[in-house]
């Protein structure tokens, strides 16, 4: 599947690798396709289905392309990792202890089969992402991830080698770390359970990126990660007025 989808219906489609790019072709209409040139790909990111419901190849573009009348800068190919749902409540086995052993064995077999499927899916997607050899494939580091709210809902953000991303819930988030001038950690106060992150870019005409409501437990780890990534950071006890700050920086960048 692809996101965003050029069709109104979601149908499994085919992705082809050509010499100079990637083509997504819908089976519904021959004119329903997405063409992406390798020269226009800024980041090619693979996200495993470990801990997620889908496996993802995400493409972040240098220049937006048109889909219908919409400009898009992110295209994502994904596949659902599981078509099985496991009853995690255990309610189905209540009062059936006589059959419990067999139920457990079935569930164990199901889980093993799902693990096998997920591993095969990860391998397949990773191989596809790497198969053109012209681009470096970035992987997400789940153990370095943290919860935050870049848009309206709480999501799990993860770093790659060069980016900070959120690729599961649209709108997607891709922050290129080399473009970041400074990160401001806002609302860092004793007694508060969370804080906000603001990424200011070297290009002052680019709007800042907010990731709000990050659990305070992630603060020390994120400070260390920013240091490791050579990104300067500063800590503020309040939320700053970024519209005013950015306007003054644009008017007088020096």
For the regions a language model picked out, list residue spans one by one.
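N-terminal recruitment modules of adaptor/scaffold proteins
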Residues: 1-34, 48, 56, 60-254
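Classical protein tyrosine phosphatase
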Residues: 53
């Amino acid at each position: 599947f692809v996101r965003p989808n050029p069709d109104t219906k979601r149908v499994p489609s085919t992705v082809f690798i050509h010499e100079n790019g990637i083509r997504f072709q819908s089976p519904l209409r021959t004119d329903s396709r997405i063409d992406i040139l390798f020269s226009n790909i800024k980041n090619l990111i693979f996200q495993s289905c470990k801990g997620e419901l889908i496996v993802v190849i995400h493409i972040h573009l240098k220049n937006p392309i048109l889909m219908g009348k919409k400009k898009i800068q992110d295209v994502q190919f994904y596949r659902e990792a599981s078509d099985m749902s496991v009853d995690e409540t255990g309610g189905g086995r209540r009062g059936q202890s006589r059959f419990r052993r067999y139920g457990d064995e079935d569930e164990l077999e199901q889980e093993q089969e799902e693990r096998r499927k997920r591993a095969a899916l990860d391998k397949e997607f990773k191989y596809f992402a790497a198969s053109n050899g012209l681009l470096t494939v970035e992987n997400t580091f789940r153990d370095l991830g943290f919860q935050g709210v870049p848009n309206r809902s709480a999501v799990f953000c993860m770093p790659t080698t060069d980016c900070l991303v959120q690729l599961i819930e649209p709108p997607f988030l891709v922050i290129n770390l080399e473009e970041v001038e400074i990160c401001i950690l806002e609302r860092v106060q004793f007694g508060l359970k969370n804080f906000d992150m603001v990424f200011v870019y070297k290009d002052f005409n680019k709007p800042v990126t907010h990731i709000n409501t990050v659990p305070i437990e992630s603060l020390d780890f994120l400070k260390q990660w920013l240091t490791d990534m050579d990104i300067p950071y500063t800590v503020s006890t309040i939320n700053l007025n970024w519209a005013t700050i950015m306007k003054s920086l644009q008017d007088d960048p020096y």
